[in-house]
A protein has these predicted regions:
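Active-site-adjacent beta->alpha loops and helix N-cap segments on the catalytic face
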Residues: 21-22, 41-64, 81-82, 106-125, ...
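Glycine-enriched alpha-helix->loop->beta-strand junction motifs that scaffold or abut catalytic
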Residues: 30-35, 60-63, 97-100, 123-127, ...
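Catalytic cores of alpha/beta
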Residues: 19-26, 30, 77-89, 136-151, ...
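N-terminal amphipathic alpha-helix/helix-capping segment at the start of soluble metabolic enzymes
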Residues: 2-17, 58
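Hydrophobic faces of well-ordered beta-strands that scaffold small-molecule active sites
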Residues: 12-16, 35-37, 65-69, 101-103, ...
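N-terminal beta1-alpha1 ligand-phosphate binding loop
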Residues: 13-25, 30, 36-40, 44-45
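Glycine-rich phosphate-binding active-site loops on the catalytic face of alpha/beta enzymes
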Residues: 36-46, 92, 96-108, 153-169, ...
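Structural motif corresponding to the early beta-alpha repeats
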Residues: 54-92
Length: 234
């Protein structure tokens, strides 16, 4: 049983959220297997420079770079022009070497904007798509998850979102019960990736209590995490 747990932990994916060229380089040099590239983390991330993506891809051709598409801060309800702008950004990111696209849109009623998502998924030209933390604000997480599965979205980045009492989890630790329910509902059809406040100290608890196999954070280092937990480096 111990060996099974060991092997499972070696397969955990830690995605490091990087808000600049320097933070991306540091994460990669520290051994990050995958990064999410964005900017303006103070407003929960915006679309970063395409030239940063191009330079990272040239310098680190083997690193998986998930690229955030978010045109502005604030809510996730976008008009037709904003949808078109982000559609064009996705196409450019694909050409610039992104490994996957991170995006998300909601309707005014806080449901998944399936029309926008279909356009963006098509623009991704077969690259995996992550639905970002707009998911935290959907009014019906279970129904929204089924919609994303039907759309072909690869993963959802979330704190767990809306809790049974109607409040929205502000961190992944707080949202553990909701995350566990989402992982169970997903049943391998889509990846549930806990994010917000995930670090080397609490990642193991979040993984064990939710069943998630990918986590996301700005302060993750898999090598340090494995050492802290007595696990061999992968």
């Amino acid at each position: 049983m111990k060996n099974k747990s060991f092997m499972d932990y070696r397969k955990i994916v830690m995605e490091v959220c990087c808000g600049s060229w320097r933070s991306a380089v540091k994460a990669i040099e520290d051994g990050a297997e995958r990064i999410e590239l964005c900017q303006a983390l103070s407003v929960d991330g915006l679309t970063p420079s395409m030239n940063v993506l191009r330079r990272l891809r040239a310098k680190y051709p083997g690193v998986r770079i998930h690229f955030l598409i978010r045109a502005r801060e604030g809510d996730f309800v976008y008009d037709d022009d904003e949808v078109a702008i982000m559609e064009a950004d996705i196409r450019e990111a694909v050409e610039a070497g992104a490994s996957a696209i991170v995006c998300g849109a909601l309707t005014p009623d806080n449901d998944i904007d399936t029309a926008a998502m279909r356009r963006w998924i098509a623009a991704a030209q077969g690259l995996p798509v992550t639905f970002h933390r707009a998911f935290d604000h959907v009014r019906d997480p279970q129904a929204a998850l089924e919609q994303l599965i039907e759309l072909g979205v690869a993963r959802v980045l979330t704190t767990g979102g809306r809790m049974p009492d109607g409040t929205i989890a502000t961190t992944a630790e707080e949202g553990i019960p909701a995350l566990r329910a989402l992982v169970e509902q997903a049943a391998g059809r889509i990846i549930i990736m806990p994010g917000c406040g995930v670090n080397n100290d609490n990642a193991r608890r979040i993984i064990e209590e939710t069943g998630a196999r990918e986590v996301h954070g700005t302060k993750l280092n898999k090598k340090i995490w494995q050492k802290q937990n007595g696990l061999a480096a992968s």
